[in-house]
Design a protein with these regions (language model features):
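Sec-dependent N-terminal signal peptides
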Residues: 4-13
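Alpha-helical transmembrane segments and their juxtamembrane interfaces
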Residues: 12-13, 50, 177
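Serine-esterase "nucleophile elbow" of acetyl-processing enzymes
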Residues: 20-72, 77-93, 97, 232-233
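C-terminal segment of classical bacterial N-terminal signal peptides
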Residues: 13-19
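Alpha-helical cap/lid subdomain in secreted, periplasmic
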Residues: 61, 83-271
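Residues that line or immediately flank small-molecule/substrate-binding pockets and catalytic motifs
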Residues: 8, 39, 101
Length: 271
């Protein structure tokens, strides 16, 4: 009898453990969702460096319905236009928006600028005593379209007003090396400052800071993407080892997409 009880207990435990394993299967939160992609040439479906872009791999792996608005050469000041186009074409029928922008702002020497405009003003305040007018400093987002932070502020103000219930996700610029298209489009690698004396790092850092300013998640592709075109060994991930280490090829896009696939597991796509 004792042996029978032990055997019965074993089968009950085994069945319970197997059931728990089955119920613990994770469904990717972005599976089957509708996702808009904003960006520049690396996102642009017409760019020839790669037939399949990072968003194409995510479509294959997660059955995502992709709305792609990236246009070659665009900078952060184009995001409001892409926002308006998405709103016009799909309204609120979208689950999330991913913004991958900034490398062209660096190349065009857009000044970094500031996040806030600050002023001294009057406001009502009472704590332990009757409320009264007091003098305080107040800050508001800088909306200067001639600066990088100002452009990000303008873009995210537009996005969060247009799509207040949607997930908005930012991707930092990735590392970049030489891009030699022609005599009038000859871009040096990130080891050099741009026209306004800034390294690419400053533009990456500003996108990361935007997470705190605007309450949006940021995935740091510069750090986690794994692509480092300044090394010849990493030229395999880019369009052309001699003339284009700016645009990832299909292998490069696949690596970026794999990184994004797993990082998106930590974020809800819809609310």
């Amino acid at each position: 009898m004792k042996r029978l009880l032990i055997l019965l207990s074993f089968f009950i435990f085994h069945f319970s453990f197997s059931s728990a394993q089955q119920s613990a299967t994770v469904v990717h939160p972005w599976q089957g969702k509708r996702v808009a992609y904003f960006g520049d040439s690396i996102t642009d479906p017409r760019n020839r460096a790669s037939e399949k872009k990072f968003w194409g791999f995510l479509t294959d792996w997660l059955d995502i319905q992709a709305y792609v608005y990236g246009v070659s050469g665009r900078q952060w000041n184009d995001i409001p236009r892409q926002t308006a186009q998405l709103l016009q074409e799909h309204g609120q029928e979208v689950d999330a928006i991913i913004v991958f922008m900034g490398t062209n702002d660096y190349n065009n020497g857009v000044p970094i600028g500031q996040w806030w405009d600050e002023r001294e003003t009057q406001v009502e305040y009472g704590h332990g005593q009757p409320k009264q007018m007091v003098t305080r400093r107040q800050r508001t987002p800088s909306m200067d379209p001639s600066t990088y932070r100002g452009r990000i502020n303008i873009a995210l103000d537009s996005l969060k007003r247009s799509f207040p219930t949607k997930q908005i996700l930012l991707l930092t610029p990735i590392h970049r090396a030489d891009f030699h298209a022609n005599e009038k489009n000859w871009q040096c690698d990130e080891s050099y400052t741009n026209q306004c004396g800034e390294y690419l790092d400053a533009y990456v850092e500003a996108v990361k800071q935007a997470a705190d300013v605007w309450a949006v998640p940021v995935i740091d592709w510069s750090a986690t993407g794994g692509l480092f075109p300044l090394m010849d060994e990493h030229a395999r991930y880019f369009n052309n080892a001699q003339t284009d280490r700016l645009h990832p090829n299909e292998l490069g896009h696949q690596r970026l997409a794999r990184t994004l696939y797993y990082q998106l597991l930590t974020l809800p796509c819809s609310f």
